Curated annotation (Swiss-Prot):
One of its GO terms (cellular component) is ribonucleoprotein complex. The keyword Ribonucleoprotein applies. It comes from the Bacteria. The keyword Ribonucleoprotein applies. This is Small ribosomal subunit protein bS21. InterPro entries: Ribosomal_bS21, Ribosomal_bS21_sf. Keywords: Ribonucleoprotein, Ribosomal protein. It comes from Methylobacterium sp. (strain 4-46). The gene is rpsU. Disulfide bonds: none annotated. Residues 76-97 have a biased composition (Low complexity). Coiled coil: none annotated. Gene3D superfamilies: Ribosomal protein S8 (1.20.5.1150). Belongs to the bacterial ribosomal protein bS21 family. One of its GO terms (molecular function) is structural constituent of ribosome.
Amino acid sequence: MQVLVRDNNVDQALRVLKKKMQREGIFREMKQRKAYEKPSVRKAREKAEAVRRARKQARKTAIREGLIAAPKPKPRAVAPRRPAAAPAPASSPTTTA
């Protein structure tokens, strides 16, 4: 995999490299190859992934065809608003009698 570094901008080149690696699935493969995976476990995992993909595709097709309603969008987290600072009370001169 090759990435061009333009104008000595290494940060941008790293971002491009990471994006390419993510797209190619290299990070996922590296994570899987950290430890040995028995062939039976590998087959079970790949089968589960295939089932998951098929379900997702069927769900998207059903939504597109109008057979089921699209899921409601999740509400965005909104930071609580701070109350406006109350004006300081005017100090009245105290009289001592």
